[in-house]
Amino acid sequence: MVTAAMVKELRERTGAGMMECKKALAHTDGDMEKAVAYLRERGLAAAAKKASRVAAEGLVEAYIHGGGRIGVLVEVNCETDFVAKTDDYKALCKDIAMQIAAAKPEYVRREEVPAEQIEKEKEILRNQALNEGKPEKIVDKMVEGRIEKYFKEICLLEQPFIKNPDVTVQQMITEAVAKIGENINVRRFVRFELGEGLAKRQDDFASEVMAEINK
């Protein structure tokens, strides 16, 4: 029987898409090593190797939402100008820009989060746990679990993909790497929201972006 844990392990080992991993495990009767070989034979396990290649071409994608109330610029790199001009790559860049507009990440990846910000958040989470009456001996484990959730909120690549929350943005990009055949890297982004930091009424821009995606 093919389990979700088996599919997850195979995806982590090969970088192949979820459906490809399910098919490979079914084809090999759940034998993990044979499934890895099966994917490699079909060129579906190449994403991890491609990740080490230089990606210096690409696009700067712009997305404006709600009559100019939210604006996003994101630089997404690939290896060749040819791929950067393809419809699949352009669609990927647009999806990433809309993700940023809707989900408000602060960083691309967790390695970019300043150490002092992480320590400050851990202290807040620790105090919250203690105020909830949790035993001090388990507080540290709770903090580690909650800080992982925090990374999933503020780091673009760890966020659930808005079009398919069953996968992260990184997993979505990994699947695109396998399909397109080149390394793809989100280098940087900037997000502007009209009146950000000023006292104003609260707007649910995330829901508005999702409504536009689902049209």
From Swiss-Prot:
The keyword Cytoplasm applies. PROSITE patterns: EF_TS_1, EF_TS_2. Pfam families: EF_TS (PF00889). GO terms for cellular component: cytoplasm. One of its GO terms (molecular function) is translation elongation factor activity. It is found in: Cytoplasm. Residues 80-83 are annotated as: Involved in Mg(2+) ion dislocation from EF-Tu. InterPro entries: EF-Ts_dimer_sf, Transl_elong_EFTs/EF1B, Transl_elong_EFTs/EF1B_dimer, Transl_elong_Ts_CS, UBA-like_sf. The keyword Protein biosynthesis applies. CDD domains: UBA_EF-Ts. Keywords: Cytoplasm, Elongation factor, Protein biosynthesis. Belongs to the EF-Ts family. NCBIfam families: tsf (TIGR00116). HAMAP family: EF_Ts (MF_00050). Associates with the EF-Tu.GDP complex and induces the exchange of GDP to GTP. It remains bound to the aminoacyl-tRNA.EF-Tu.GTP complex up to the GTP hydrolysis stage on the ribosome. This is Elongation factor Ts. It comes from Heliobacterium modesticaldum (strain ATCC 51547 / Ice1). The gene is tsf.
